[in-house]
Amino acid sequence: DYISQLVPILDRTFARGGNVVIPSFAVGRTQELLYFIRQIKEERMLKNYNDFPVYVDSPLAVEATNVFCDSYSDFDDEAASLIENGINPIAFPNLYVSVTSEESKAINSDPAPKVIISASGMCEAGRIRHHLKHNLWRPECTILFVG
């Protein structure tokens, strides 16, 4: 169960004042993470940090998320039920997307604990390298590989 594993990681990292940086594939995995994070926030599983910001930092992931949102007919029963009740299964308060490189760079200037989901699941190129440069050396931060 992804959520039961994700909650303590978020809780420990935020308690230390750190960021959770998640290298993720832009299509599929990013949207799955947003689905789980929405549930964590909605059910208030992080009692002291429920309003944490989440940044999706990848133009391709942003586009894929938009396509995903337009494909409601392809959702499973659980997601379809959420939609029928007026809930977007991958949207929530404090979700931010960055498209430009300036927006991407600004993410690391915010000292508040946050989740950064950035494309390039293998960390070989792209914006994730910028986020690793700013967070990898910080012991309070967590780099979370989600496959």
Identify the meaning behind each predicted range.
Residues 1-147:
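Acidic/His-rich, metal-assisted hydrolase cores and their charged scaffolds
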